[in-house]
């Protein structure tokens, strides 16, 4: 079964996280976002993964954001995907 990782991180971390994920062959969609939790200057990354890829993707995100020494780290959600259609 697939999972959808939704990661909301400061803009200054977004390129590094996207690059680290794509280097490991994960597909990433970036959306500019603003919200009440982290305020402005955020990006939302959407990453669809198979169950067996989940831990690797989460580790890549965590290591990349932690290495940035950013004060605002971000927030992450993992959602079960019932159906995935690629066209």
Model region roles, listed by residue range:
Residues 1-87:
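Positively charged, small/polar-rich N-terminal and surface patches that mediate targeting and assembly
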């Amino acid at each position: 079964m697939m999972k959808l990782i939704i990661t909301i991180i400061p803009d200054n971390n977004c390129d590094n996280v996207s690059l680290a994920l794509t280097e490991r062959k994960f597909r990433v969609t970036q959306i500019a976002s603003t919200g009440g939790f982290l305020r402005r200057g955020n990006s939302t990354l959407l990453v669809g993964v198979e169950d067996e890829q989940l831990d690797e993707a989460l580790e890549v995100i965590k290591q990349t954001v932690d290495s940035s020494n950013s004060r605002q780290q971000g927030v992450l959600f993992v959602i079960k995907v019932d159906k995935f259609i690629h066209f």
